[in-house]
Amino acid sequence: FLSLALAALPKFLCLVFKKC
């Protein structure tokens, strides 16, 4: 589960901060 969360974190930050 942790590995999945770490994999999704960059995309989440990308959506939140609009820095893709």
Swiss-Prot record:
It comes from the Eukaryota. Expressed by the skin glands. Disulfide bonds join C14-C20. One of its GO terms (cellular component) is extracellular region. Keywords: Amphibian defense peptide, Antibiotic, Antimicrobial, Cytolysis, Disulfide bond, Hemolysis, Secreted. GO terms for biological process: defense response to bacterium; killing of cells of another organism. InterPro entries: Antimicrobial_frog_1. It is found in: Secreted. Its main location: secreted. Antimicrobial peptide. Has low activity against the Gram-positive bacterium S.aureus and the Gram-negative bacterium E.coli (MIC<15 uM). Has a strong hemolytic activity. Belongs to the frog skin active peptide (FSAP) family. Brevinin subfamily. This is Brevinin-1DYa. It comes from Rana dybowskii.
